[in-house]
Design a protein with these regions (language model features):
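Short, basic (Lys/Arg/His-rich) helix/loop patches that form interaction surfaces
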Residues: 123-127, 198, 202-205, 215, ...
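Short, Lys/Arg-enriched alpha-helical recognition elements, typified by the DNA-recognition helix
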Residues: 57-163, 177, 324-326, 341, ...
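Arg/Lys-rich amphipathic alpha helix in sigma70-family domain 2
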Residues: 160-169, 304-307
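Conserved tyrosine-mediated DNA breakage-rejoining catalytic core shared by Y-recombinases
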Residues: 7, 192, 225-307, 318
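Short, surface-exposed polybasic/aromatic micro-patch for ligand or macromolecular engagement
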Residues: 2-58, 285
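Short regulatory "switch" loops immediately downstream of catalytic or recognition motifs
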Residues: 16-19, 113-136, 231-234, 244-257, ...
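Basic, Lys/Arg- and aromatic-enriched nucleic-acid-binding interface segment
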Residues: 127-145, 149-151, 164-227, 235-238, ...
Length: 346
């Protein structure tokens, strides 16, 4: 039962409840008028009786997200890249703005205002939770609507867990996600593709772009290919290539906190003391594993490329470190995604 006490010019409702650990605690709520206190006495007694009383908890948004993160990662068997990306969202897009706010005090309006703030926030303003000094040009490059929708989706999931944990009666997340405007990407026709390939003199870049254009492969899928994935005699001699893995660079800390079954292989460090590693991982979805047909020009280029790899190995005179990938550096080590992207930009 609850009781009402007068304390100076206000009235307090006193009651007892059990916290999440089962300990008996005493609650106090103050009101300006006796009528407000009487109404609250009736409602709190009903809540305590039917189990709808919200146990007070000072957990902050940051604490809740870092509690939710490993559970969600383990439950859904996240890839290391997904884990790293989610940590970055929490550190750089949520904690600086909502991190210290207690989750039981977060209102839907607060989140609407938060999304509005993000829409005016420059990309890269925070890195690893530390505010950066930006150039005038960088200050004009704002977060995309897609990034804000991604934050919304993450918070929606995390706050639903808080409800399940009994920390909230209902989620404060707005029903509608922030709107996102998508820009149409220009699709190259065959003539444009051929013209682009003719300007590329680097054989590694040429083959990578050729694979991307003809087979619609992502960078990670291209670099994840191995010579054994190619069957030059399949499809009545047309030839096929099978996509079944992806190569990514990921933080070593993320590898320790994600499902090891998602990883096929971790390549040795090329730089001593590196905090990241190149890994071969499972494809994003089951549909990502597929077998594709080669065109005649692509088949010819792949045959020439395999011969180049053999010549590279001979030229290294025993110092060649065959990583087993289709795309390799002259010393046999794998080509990293960031290296391929850099070559493409230059």
């Amino acid at each position: 039962m609850a009781s009402i006490l007068r304390r100076g010019d206000s009235y307090s409702v006193r009651f007892k409840y059990k916290d999440h650990a089962g300990r008996i605690c005493e609650g106090w709520e103050s009101f300006k008028t006796k009528k407000e206190a009487q109404d609250r006495k009736i409602s709190v007694e009903k809540e305590l009786l039917d189990g709808t009383f919200l146990i007070p908890d000072a957990m902050t948004v940051a604490e809740m997200l870092y509690k939710w993160l490993p559970i969600q990662s383990s439950k859904h068997k996240w890839a290391p890249k997904t884990y790293t990306h989610t940590v970055a969202m929490i550190q750089n897009l949520v904690v600086p703005y909502l991190g210290k706010k207690q989750i039981q005090k977060v209102q839907t309006y607060d989140l609407e205002q938060f999304y509005a703030t993000l829409s005016r926030t420059p990309r890269g303003l925070y890195k690893q939770g530390v505010k950066q000094t930006l150039t005038d040009k960088q200050k004009r490059q704002f977060l995309t609507g897609a990034s804000i929708r991604e934050v919304h989706a993450m918070l929606k999931t995390a706050f639903s867990y808080a409800v399940e944990w009994g920390l909230l009666l209902k989620s404060p997340i707005p029903r509608e996600a922030p709107k996102s405007t998508s820009e149409e990407r220009a699709i190259w026709d065959e003539k444009t593709m051929l013209a682009a390939l003719q300007t590329m003199t680097d054989p590694t870049l040429h083959l990578a772009v050729h694979l991307s254009m003809i087979l619609s492969l992502r960078v990670g899928e291209i670099l994840g290919l191995q010579p054994g994935d190619i069957d030059f005699d399949a499809a009545d001699g047309r030839g096929t290539i099978t996509v079944g893995r992806s190569l990514q660079r990921t933080e070593k800390a993320a590898l320790e906190k994600t499902d090891p079954n998602q990883i096929y292989h971790i390549f040795p460090d090329q730089r001593e003391g590196s905090s990241s590693a190149l890994v071969l991982k499972k494809p994003k979805t089951k549909k990502s594993s597929r077998t594709l047909y080669l065109t005649k020009p692509l088949k010819e280029e792949l045959l020439a490329w395999l011969e180049k790899l053999r010549q590279d190995e001979l030229a290294m005179d025993g110092r060649y470190r065959n990583c087993g990938q289709l795309f390799r550096l002259p010393n046999g080590m794998p080509v990293a995604p960031e290296a391929l992207s850099k070559w493409y930009r230059t």
